[in-house]
């Protein structure tokens, strides 16, 4: 197939530029490697170079009045090109034209633009982008050039074959304008001459506008995390390659995959752009450079430190340097997965044992303060213990961990409470009186004491504290009540407190020498209260002793049974003996299959039944005799 150009003369100004093939709509996608055999033919490079030179000379010397005649000459030259190409078809190769949308020169509509192909020397040769200025006749034909601040950029590329240096000079605005302006509004003066380069793209001068973002290809199995980087820079277009050099291109692709993180080749030349074509295709130019992670990191305890690079422990936000992002967290709000999990809480109040205060009515406030201070000092200085309450229940085992108890940073710590308890070796020394007084300090650092009146103080019976301790609530303290206030009726008018003070309990007049310290028994432990009720089954020996005592004494004298057979057994009460006898009677009256508990010999059960019948009948006789005697007494009284 021969490269053909069609020059159409006409239009509003009498001249039309040659049609330049446009890039396909799917240029962002991967260019198919299949091409027809017609496109792989080689053209006569020398002939095209000479014709291009003639066209350039004619275009420079032409004017707007001679455009029509030059159009006819171009048709003649087009036919001549076709004829000469057919003659040199089998001798020299020719590279097909292509359109590079990433090159601004391909977007211009300059007249008589032609493509020249030089003999292929090596697949390592880089392309040359060369532009030469043309006359201003094109601007008279209605075209517009770039307006604004223009910067000049020069790129020189070395050739291996001819050792030639080509200066690539062009004018360029902001690269974002290249996407917004149409080909009719963008003009870059000059013709373009391209050298054959199957591995390169003829826009090496646009290196500053390519996508050179590195994508880390390492992928760990433990932490699969990738990111995509979008770019708003100019997209590059890879031209179609020749069929004859497909093997060379495949070898270059294999080499480029190994050097995907390098910017230049080892020999110092520019790197082929198609190595990064996957970075350029498929992304919209208006998207910002953003990192999108495929996996969302959880904020419930998982902390990842970013130290650059992509691995199972880090993610880099930049191709060159990673930024560190340390995760901070609070142990009181989120659950931690580390072994150093800590539970943080604040103690607003403590429960203290009950303090009963006794003061005479004639005592001064200073004496009352000293008395309370001595009581509190005796409590705190004598040794105290700390109690822990979880959901209102006291935790008694000190060896349990916080997680076993139900306390962790993930749980609500509002269910946690503490109490102050007197030590085992000391007893609280409160002050007791017939009319105790309740003190409510307003300062948050002071303790509050609770008083309770009890008639047991007069008889000398020790006053046990209440079962429930009282919580010190800072918000419920009485304002302006820093001191204990006696009853207003017993205080002189000049010494009466202000109206906002409140008398809690009236204090009766007592002599000053009546002040005394009465120790109050320590609150009995639950274990001691329930120790007697612990189930202690009767042994066979105890059952035999019980049966013998009942046979002698009877079933109505359990205290005598206790003194006769269980005098030294302090854990056996007469009530226990009575309950056990009833159980034995019931066990003996049922079948052996229905019996539960420890087995009792059948001989003892028979004795139980015999004793039970005997004493039942004896009791009935006693009741009958008593009724007869009562009847006789009543009749004798009535006869009188």
Swiss-Prot record:
Pfam families: Ubiquitin_TPR1. Residues 530-589 form the HTH myb-type domain. Its main location: nucleus. Binds specifically to the plant telomeric double-stranded DNA sequences 5'-TTTAGGG-3'. At least 2 repeats of telomeric sequences are required for binding. Induces DNA bending. Homomultimer. Interacts with SNL1 (via PAH2). Interacts with STO. This is Telomere repeat-binding protein 4. The keyword Glycoprotein does not apply. Keywords: DNA-binding, Nucleus, Transcription, Transcription regulation. It comes from Arabidopsis thaliana. Residues 442-464 are annotated as: Disordered. It is found in: Nucleus. Disruption phenotype: Viable, but deregulation of telomere length control. GO terms for biological process: telomere maintenance. GO terms for molecular function: DNA binding; double-stranded telomeric DNA binding; telomeric DNA binding.
